[in-house]
């Protein structure tokens, strides 16, 4: 390869990446998922598009995709909070195992019939498209305001269900090559090894990497590079030992994100940019790999298979997988059924048969690509509407426009949050002494018209003021309500009810003050929170959980870390 060819590749690559970034600004205006933009640009630059680039190097695409996926999962794991595991670990694992098997099986049966394939070949297509995609889920869920149970379930499921899909795909390819039609008992042994090594090396490697980062002194810019190189090493090492590298790198990131670590916020900021670059490169490469004209040949059966996957296979897998978990409402189950987002992983898995030289490998790839495209276009674009329809959205709270970690010590949890006030903020005009700041938070600085003020308790806030608040991550919900864009009472009443009460309030006192009548005798020692938790029937509660009893809708309005702190109540026949 001469220098002119290398320069040409640099120019083409920079145009594709830069164009993807610039065009991504239109995705929200058009209501199209940003990942579709990246895929479309790759397809336009490909052999059937305006660019005319002939790219059919499957090993290179596989290399790029795996490297990108490792970075995306490392970043996603680091942003997954431990509270998410408390809320949705076991349901998510059920969906990541039983759910994937059901989805793959039902999809495989339909694929075999639609494309006239052997049952084992149909099952291979089902395995390829059987898992949801972490890149798509992390990208599309960020600003939708879903309740914690739904968000946690989707994030953990997408981060942990790829190993099952990978394992099924590799197993079925080997069976086709060897002429097998039945699984043997070694299937279970290999499955346990995949998950076991993934969990052990992921958690152990994450802990070891955290210890190294905290014990070595480096320039701040090098800590993110050390973290990402360590994560990729865990991915590669686990894969080399025939474990699940995908699960290992996700858990490695989870450990780093939930333990004290030096330069946490520098690492997170760098990871954010690296994850976006990884998504762009991965979807561009996969878009280049496909020949769009070939998709028309399988369009009708592939469309039918896509709809079967979305409307039959995925819903059945959700309802069966969540059968033991009674704390999921029907609305949540229906929403989870619809949001089975497919993304890069099915396309990457579709490369496996190409590299193995199977007879119908090109068809498998085209079908997987078509299903991903339909999933992103239909499910991705309708995600917000479906969430509102299923009523799994909770009232939003204001987020800081910027947050910076105060990395004085790895154990230091303090951060600086920046809030800017607009005319719609309810606290504009209020004196600082009237703000009910969360305990252990302080307003460190107040800027007005780009001038640093020296505020007193009597200083009144104005539109355009910028507040610098010192606090901890757990203070964000309370600060968000304090600086929300509409009066909190009106905002909360629309969702939580007419009255929002302390969960520690005595139930008998509440019934007496508000004129509530109970069919039975009220326990004098029972608090409002205990009463509602008993009605909900167990499980980890989340904000927005509600239950109708005694003619009243009881809704969890606020949680303080793991404890319910406020309950909303309204008459049951009152319109929401």
UniProtKB/Swiss-Prot annotation:
GO terms for cellular component: plasma membrane. Keywords: Antiport, Cell inner membrane, Cell membrane, Ion transport, Membrane, Potassium, Potassium transport, Transmembrane, Transmembrane helix, Transport. Its main location: membrane. Residues 404-485 form the RCK C-terminal domain. It comes from the Bacteria. NCBIfam families: PRK05326.1-1 (NF003714), PRK05326.1-2 (NF003715), PRK05326.1-3 (NF003716). This is K(+)/H(+) antiporter NhaP2.
């Amino acid at each position: 390869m001469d220098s002119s060819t290398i320069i040409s590749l640099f120019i083409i690559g920079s145009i594709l990446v830069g164009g993807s970034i610039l065009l991504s600004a239109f995705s929200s205006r058009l209501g199209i998922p940003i990942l579709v933009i990246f895929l479309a640009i790759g397809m336009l630059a490909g052999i059937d598009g305006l660019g005319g680039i002939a790219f059919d190097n499957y090993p290179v695409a596989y290399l790029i995709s795996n490297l990108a996926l490792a970075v995306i999962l490392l970043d996603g794991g680091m942003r997954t909070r431990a509270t998410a595991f408390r809320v949705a670990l076991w349901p998510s694992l059920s969906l990541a195992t039983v759910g994937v098997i059901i989805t793959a099986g039902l999809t495989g049966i339909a694929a075999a019939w639609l494309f006239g394939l052997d049952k084992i070949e149909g099952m291979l297509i089902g395995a390829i498209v059987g898992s949801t995609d972490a890149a798509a889920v992390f990208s599309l869920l960020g600003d939708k305001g879903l309740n914690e149970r739904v968000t946690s379930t989707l994030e953990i499921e997408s981060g942990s269900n790829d190993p099952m899909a990978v394992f099924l795909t590799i197993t079925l390819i080997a069976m086709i090559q060897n002429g097998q039609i039945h699984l043997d008992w070694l299937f279970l042994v290999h499955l346990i090894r995949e998950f076991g090594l993934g969990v052990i090396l992921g958690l152990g490697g994450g802990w070891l990497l955290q210890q190294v980062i905290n014990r070595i002194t480096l320039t701040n810019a090098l800590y993110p590079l050390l973290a990402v190189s360590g994560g990729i090493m865990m991915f590669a090492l686990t894969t080399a030992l025939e474990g699940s590298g995908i699960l290992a790198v996700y858990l490695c990131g989870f450990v780093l994100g939930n333990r004290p670590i030096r330069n946490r916020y520098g690492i997170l900021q760098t990871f954010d940019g690296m994850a976006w670059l990884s998504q762009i490169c991965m979807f561009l490469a996969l878009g280049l790999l496909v020949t769009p004209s070939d998709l028309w040949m399988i369009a009708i059966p592939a469309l039918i298979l896509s709809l079967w996957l979305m409307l039959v296979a995925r819903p059945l897998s959700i309802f069966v997988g969540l059968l033991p978990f009674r704390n999921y409402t029907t609305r949540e189950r229906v929403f989870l059924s619809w949001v089975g987002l497919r993304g890069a992983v099915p396309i990457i898995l579709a490369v496996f048969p190409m590299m193995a030289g199977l007879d119908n490998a090109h068809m498998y790839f085209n079908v997987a690509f078509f299903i991903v495209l339909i999933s992103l276009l239909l499910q991705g674009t309708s995600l917000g509407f479906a969430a509102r329809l299923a009523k799994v959205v909770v009232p939003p709270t204001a987020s800081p426009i910027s947050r910076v970690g105060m990395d004085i010590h790895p154990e230091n949890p303090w951060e600086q949050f920046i809030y800017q006030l607009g005319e719609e903020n309810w606290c504009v005009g209020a004196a600082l002494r009237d703000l009910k700041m969360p305990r252990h938070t302080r307003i460190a600085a107040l800027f007005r018209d780009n001038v640093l003020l020296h505020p007193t308790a009597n200083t009144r806030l104005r539109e355009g003021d910028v507040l610098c608040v010192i606090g901890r991550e757990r203070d964000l919900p309370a600060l968000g309500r304090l600086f929300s864009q509409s009066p909190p009472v009106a905002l909360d009443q629309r969702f939580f009810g007419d009255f929002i009460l302390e969960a520690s309030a005595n139930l008998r006192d509440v019934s007496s003050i508000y004129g509530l009548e109970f069919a039975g005798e009220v326990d004098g020692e029972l608090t409002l929170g205990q009463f509602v938790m008993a009605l909900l029937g167990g499980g980890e509660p989340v904000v927005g959980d509600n239950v109708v009893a005694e003619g009243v809708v009881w809704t969890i309005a606020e949680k303080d870390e793991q404890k319910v702190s406020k309950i909303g109540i309204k008459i049951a026949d009152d319109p929401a």
